[in-house]
A protein has these predicted regions:
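N-terminal glycine-rich phosphate/pyrophosphate-binding loop and immediately adjacent elements
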Residues: 1-102
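A conserved FAD-binding loop/helix module that cradles the flavin
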Residues: 36, 425-447
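Rossmann-like flavin
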Residues: 75-156
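A glycine-rich dinucleotide-binding beta-alpha-beta segment and adjacent secondary-structure elements
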Residues: 138-148, 365-429
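Helical element adjacent to the flavin cofactor pocket in flavoenzyme catalytic cores
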Residues: 163-218
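Mid-domain catalytic core of redox enzymes
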Residues: 174, 204-317
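Active-site-proximal substrate-binding core of FAD-dependent oxidoreductases
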Residues: 208, 448-453
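C-terminal segments that line or cap access tunnels to active or ligand-binding sites in enzymes
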Residues: 274-380
């Protein structure tokens, strides 16, 4: 966005490849995604279409998921299918729950209220229970959100819930390829407009002089000067990069460091035998218990629900790799914090194996014999994400938003240092939709700053 406006942009990426949670990684001959599984609102006129069109991302091979069923939900001994399009979706839910027609009409109206200030101050769970009386329908309306946000009854704002659900009901899309395609497209766009992206540049310090950041210092000894600095690291990490500062107050640093974070994700990546399973153009969500608002894996290691996503096959009509995701609390892996990637202790590996076994058991209730189709597996935990992306507690969605105190949990892109800005999922909204909108807002604030100066 800034490069297109004529600014000279330099991106410093701490990892060997750019992209953060959008990137994919290679094992054997396959690429596996870390965070990009499907995207909502890419139809013309949809919530993300204009932004993606402007960024050149609509040139990528997006494939729409099944119109009649992009989410297949197995919960409470029944199967529910979500179709795309708000009207079709509401009608489908009415066919499952005809006695909830009035509440579902109100829910349909809610999906259009994505910019209402009142939603930031409204508890999502309390609002949903005020319009929906059937407890199973409440779970069906929430199930696909389990790996999109932290479904926490006590704190989740209605604003966050609706923004995480509505774009996908508009339309849902998978990329015919891996997340690196999206990352490469963005990098190419930056370079086409005169910018640059440098990898293996781990910023360890932001140097301040006369009330402004003047330099970014990297672990390899290199340094870079600029007029404006934008950090998409977690706000607590951003604050730690700034040394002694007369402008960045201790109370602000303390607030960023003490703010509760959302849970992380356990991901099980499966490589399947060739030709063993036909491709399914939808997600499968499977729940051991009919309560998706309390399902994060804790120290008991009980897996209560999973989401399954299949990669679009490059050739033929059979699945080659599947990702299985389930929420996981930081407390499960906290004792292993400080151990090194690929050199974790035996107990950590045993813990991952126990969780993976339960994920597979749930998956086999809807795909019988899946275990026999598997060639290889890999898995990651919140600790993996912390070590790669420096996200405190391996949080999947950044700061926990709280309806009861939105001013404390919704962070401004502006910091107390006039030329240091922040962006990313801890600010306004998380997810691909959220960080795109937040990035646009950050750019607006930078432009305001430039005009005022």
């Amino acid at each position: 966005m800034m490069a297109k406006e004529g600014r000279k942009v330099l991106v410093l990426e701490r990892q060997h490849q750019a992209g953060g949670c959008m990137q994919s990684y290679r094992r054997g001959r396959l690429n596996f995604d870390t965070g990009l599984h499907y995207v909502g609102g890419l139809e013309e006129g949809g919530q993300l279409y204009d932004a993606f069109e402007s960024l050149g991302l609509m040139t990528l091979p997006w494939k729409q998921m099944d119109a009649d069923c992009f989410e297949e939900i197995h919960i409470g001994g029944r199967t529910f299918r979500w179709p795309q399009g708000k009207k079709r979706f509401i009608n489908a839910m009415k066919s499952y729950f005809p006695e909830e027609e009035k509440g579902l009409d109100l829910y349909g109206e809610l999906l259009d209220c994505t910019d209402e200030l009142w939603m930031q101050k409204t508890n999502a769970w309390e609002y949903l229970t005020s319009i929906i009386s059937d407890p199973l329908l409440l779970q069906v309306l929430s199930a696909p959100a389990t790996c999109k946000m932290e479904l926490r009854k006590e704190t989740l704002p209605l604003f966050t819930y609706v923004h995480g659900i509505a774009p996908f009901i508009e339309s849902s899309w998978r990329l015919a390829g891996d997340g690196n395609m999206l990352v490469s497209c963005l990098v190419e766009q930056i370079r086409a407009y005169g910018g640059e992206v440098l990898t293996d540049k781990d910023v360890v310090s932001l140097k301040e002089e006369n009330g402004r950041i003047v330099q970014a210092l990297c672990a390899d000894g290199t340094s870079y000067e600029a007029g404006f600095f934008v950090s998409n690291a977690h706000p607590a990490v951003t604050c730690s990069l700034v040394g002694e500062s007369a402008l960045m107050k201790k109370v602000f640093r303390r607030r960023m460091g003490m703010q509760p974070n959302t849970f992380g994700i356990f991901t099980l990546h499966l490589q399947l035998r060739s030709g063993s399973l036909p491709y399914f153009n939808h997600n499968k969500l499977v729940f051991a218990e009919p309560d998706c608002w309390d399902m994060a894996v804790d120290k008991s290691l009980a897996v209560k629900g999973i989401m399954m996503s299949a990669r679009i096959p490059e050739k033929g009509g059979n699945v080659v790799n599947i990702d299985i995701l389930t929420p996981m609390l930081w407390e499960v892996v906290e004792e292993y914090d400080g151990t090194k990637l690929f050199h974790r202790p035996k107990a950590y590996k045993e813990m991952k194996a126990r969780v993976a076994e339960q994920c597979l058991a749930l998956a086999e209730t809807v795909i019988p014999g899946l275990g026999e189709m598997i060639l290889k597996t890999w898995s990651s935990t919140p600790l993996t994400y912390k070590d790669y992306n420096l996200t405190p507690e391996g949080s999947a969605f950044g700061f926990r938003k709280d309806f009861s105190n939105p001013m404390m949990t919704i962070v401004s892109p502006k910091t107390q240092i006039p030329n240091l800005f922040m962006t990313g999922q801890s600010l306004m909204l998380h997810g691909l939709h959220g960080v795109t909108m937040t990035a646009a807002y950050t750019c607006q604030e930078i432009n305001k700053n430039t005009i005022s100066e």
